């Protein structure tokens, strides 16, 4: 069995990089922000899983080009993996380098001349609610007794929707008419990205919008209904006819792609995955799905395209590496003669990129 890369917090890491913080009351407008990354703490209903304060981040840039990024950081939906003293599988707080864009590389390497997003405006939706940004619930989970602890309960604030919408509401109020918008996310954020791309399209119907999910395409199966039910995701679905037939016991991650594709006419949808992604295998095991990841990816891709009637552009690399957008491999991975950075740049430019698929899928591109 593949080893699950747990997102265990063993201590709070100090934020590094240059951040300007704004906290409480009315958030500053775009023209009041400093250069570089600004930390905004919206307050109100926003909250992290353990009750600590939430924050998102903004980096001013070209207002015609807007990047909205949903960070990853695991998830939980039953006691043993929600309890920070047991086997946690998520990041519970904002105050960690994991949620600090100033510490990331890849698309956040702003001084790299190959970065297609170097001059873009960026909104970074940090993540600390263990619900892949699409929860609206406060849940008390039972944690059974183990060798080193008695049975007990743990309460988790699955308020990812409130947190994400605080960032989007600020964005909608401060960016009037961006021409091109890249809505993306890694891991947990990848799952949420098609859902929020649809809401962004409703706000900016004249913009050209590109969505890319980074490393979460394999969660295909009815077993995912357990976490979606725990997070009360059905309650956040917008009042679109495309969701009329979706029920709480039938909701899938593919539905988020299909509904947005059917609802909009200005969104291009795409995914990146590694064919043997170690972390996807780990979470698949937790939900009870044992099928090979390449099979699940293929089935999910086909489901999205057949139900939406739209093309889903995919780039599937070999190997086990989980996520790419925040990593140096964003610039180095090459499959079938196509570098990933070039594929993304062409995708965002509105070009027909086609699908890219590994020939040797059990090793990473730089190991072929």
For the regions a protein language model found, what residue spans apply to each?
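Sec/Tat signal peptide C-region and signal peptidase I cleavage site
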Residues: 18-21
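Bacterial N-terminal signal peptides
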Residues: 7-16
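Positively charged n-region of N-terminal signal peptides that target proteins for export
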Residues: 1-4
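C-terminal His-loop and adjacent cap/lid subdomain of alpha/beta-hydrolase
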Residues: 23-368
């Amino acid at each position: 069995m593949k080893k699950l890369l747990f997102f265990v917090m063993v201590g709070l890491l100090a934020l590094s990089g240059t951040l300007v913080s704004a906290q409480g009351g009315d958030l500053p407008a775009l023209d009041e922000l400093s250069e570089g990354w600004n930390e905004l703490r919206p307050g109100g209903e926003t909250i992290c899983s353990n009750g600590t304060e939430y924050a998102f981040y903004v980096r001013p840039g070209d207002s015609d080009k807007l990047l909205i990024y949903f960070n990853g950081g695991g998830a939980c939906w039953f006691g043993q993996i929600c309890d920070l003293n047991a086997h946690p599988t998520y990041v519970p707080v904002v105050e960690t380098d994991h949620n600090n864009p100033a510490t990331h590389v890849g698309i956040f390497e702003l001084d790299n001349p190959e970065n297609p997003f170097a001059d873009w405006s960026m909104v970074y939706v940090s993540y600390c609610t263990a619900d892949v940004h699409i929860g609206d619930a406060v849940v008390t989970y039972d944690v059974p007794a183990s060798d080193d602890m008695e049975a007990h309960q743990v309460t988790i604030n699955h308020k990812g929707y409130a947190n994400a919408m605080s960032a989007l509401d600020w964005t909608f109020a401060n960016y009037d008419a961006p021409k091109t918008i890249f809505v993306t996310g890694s891991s947990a954020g990848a799952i949420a990205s098609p859902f929020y791309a649809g809401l962004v399209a409703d706000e900016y119907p004249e913009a050209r919008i590109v969505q890319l999910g980074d490393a979460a395409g394999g969660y295909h199966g009815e077993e995912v209904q357990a976490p979606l039910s725990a997070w009360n995701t059905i309650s956040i679905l917008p009042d679109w006819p495309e969701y009329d037939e979706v029920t709480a016991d039938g909701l899938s991650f593919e539905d988020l792609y299909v509904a947005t594709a059917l609802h909009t006419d200005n969104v291009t949808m795409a995914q990146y995955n590694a064919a043997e992604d170690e972390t996807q295998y780990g979470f698949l095991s937790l939900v009870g799905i044992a099928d090979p990841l390449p099979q699940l990816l293929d089935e999910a891709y086909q489901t999205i395209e057949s139900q939406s009637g739209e093309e889903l552009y995919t780039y599937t690399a070999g190997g086990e590496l989980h996520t790419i957008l925040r990593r140096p491999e964003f610039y180095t991975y090459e499959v079938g003669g196509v570098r990933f950075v070039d594929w993304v740049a062409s995708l965002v430019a509105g070009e027909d990129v086609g699908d890219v698929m590994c020939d040797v899928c059990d090793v990473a591109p730089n190991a072929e």
